[in-house]
């Protein structure tokens, strides 16, 4: 017996029928499932008469969604639409964007190369600002050159009573009269004067022959010290 010829099924698949229906019913807004089923039943009754028609129909829609040929703009219960293929203008825009990005990256690289100049400018600015530090040093030196209580007392003892000595009270008055700007706002003035006298006695620059409450006299070492001031 001759072998039977195998005939291929030329019926279009459900997905193709849905695409056909969408194109035929195209009004710019898509088509509902009901409208698509009606179109297939009206134009392909042999396919629509299959008992599992609804199952095949829904499965074809699902496959079309997965392959990005269909989409539901308003969700599965809304209308079904064909996905528009990417246009040539979109490709052109993409190329233009790539060119712009390339230009921007080139410009950014050029600006990166120029950054060392900024660093040099900053370094130069730092060098110019160095004299300010010198000014601070000068100010510090001026402050440190202010007369001390020791120096005021040595000067006072020499200036009063022909250098023969002076009482604490007389020395304090002398200091307030001669150096008002140095002591007028000092709260612990008495303490500073007494402490300076005590240190002068200990260092051998001053002496109190009659004891702490007596006259303050200047010694040879004190006279030599005051000359160097």
Swiss-Prot record:
One of its GO terms (molecular function) is nucleosomal DNA binding. Residues 81-143 are annotated as: Disordered. Residues 10-84, 145-220 form the H15 domain. It is found in: Nucleus; Chromosome. Residues 84-94 have a biased composition (Low complexity). Keywords: Chromosome, DNA-binding, Nucleus, Repeat. It comes from the Eukaryota. The keyword Repeat applies. GO terms for biological process: chromosome condensation; negative regulation of DNA recombination; nucleosome assembly. Belongs to the histone H1/H5 family. This is Histone H1. It comes from Candida glabrata (strain ATCC 2001 / BCRC 20586 / JCM 3761 / NBRC 0622 / NRRL Y-65 / CBS 138). The gene is HHOA.
């Amino acid at each position: 017996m001759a072998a039977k010829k195998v005939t291929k099924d030329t019926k279009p698949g459900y997905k193709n029928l849905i695409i056909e229906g969408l194109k035929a019913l195209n009004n710019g807004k898509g088509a509902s499932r009901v409208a698509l089923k009606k179109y297939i039943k009206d134009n392909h009754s042999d396919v629509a008469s299959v008992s599992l028609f609804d199952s095949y129909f829904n499965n074809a829609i699902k496959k079309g969604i997965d392959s990005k040929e269909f989409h539901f703009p308003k969700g599965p219960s809304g209308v079904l639409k064909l996905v528009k293929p990417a246009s040539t203008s979109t490709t052109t825009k993409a190329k233009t964007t790539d060119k712009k990005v390339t230009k921007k990256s080139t410009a950014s690289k050029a600006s990166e190369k120029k950054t060392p100049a900024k660093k040099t400018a900053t370094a130069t600015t730092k060098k110019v600002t160095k004299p300010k530090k010198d000014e601070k040093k000068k100010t510090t030196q001026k402050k440190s050159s202010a007369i001390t209580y020791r120096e005021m007392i040595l000067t006072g003892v020499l200036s009063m009573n022909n250098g023969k000595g002076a009482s604490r009270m007389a020395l304090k008055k002398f200091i307030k009269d001669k150096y008002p700007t140095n002591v007028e706002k000092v709260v612990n003035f008495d303490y500073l004067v007494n402490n300076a006298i005590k240190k002068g006695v200990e260092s051998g620059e001053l002496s109190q022959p009659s004891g702490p409450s007596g006259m303050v006299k200047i010694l040879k070492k004190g006279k030599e010290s005051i000359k160097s001031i």
